């Protein structure tokens, strides 16, 4: 199998789905432009691809998790917008950051708008598949807990600034929350939507978290 081609095809599917959930026609125009700014600047689309590949890995079809795949990318970009504000970063993906172009108030609401759409897209996915209530609850429980854990990771990252005595355990805990949590949620949600069994869901969730930790170690 041509892995690169496989991922490119799924990335294109995700782009189309993102446009459906957060189109350029969103009003007011400044909200659409600010919210979509980093989405249109590129990115690896790693998280949505994890959703789709995990879904397929347990026997589901790629279309079974397409709304969720878009939702995870929207959530990721929400965290990037707010992260850039806190870190005072001026560039990301070779373009100016949202708060630099539109100011912090607009950047905050642009991120919030993306976050709101996450749950709408997930709800649509669950409704379309007619997910059993217990599995739908697990879907939203997963995304909610991951969102909170990302906040914990970011808080730790901020507290670590200026410290020179950070232990390996502290560092791994921080990146596990800040980066690993969202990739864990991505692979777990894909497995849930693909109708994976408990062992499959658990294994893919653990895999996603480890991928996230490894990714962040390499990035750092």
Task: List each model region and its residues.
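Mg2+-dependent prenyl diphosphate-binding active-site environment of isoprenoid biosynthetic enzymes
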Residues: 19-220
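N-terminal amphipathic/basic leader segments beginning at the initiator methionine
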Residues: 1-22
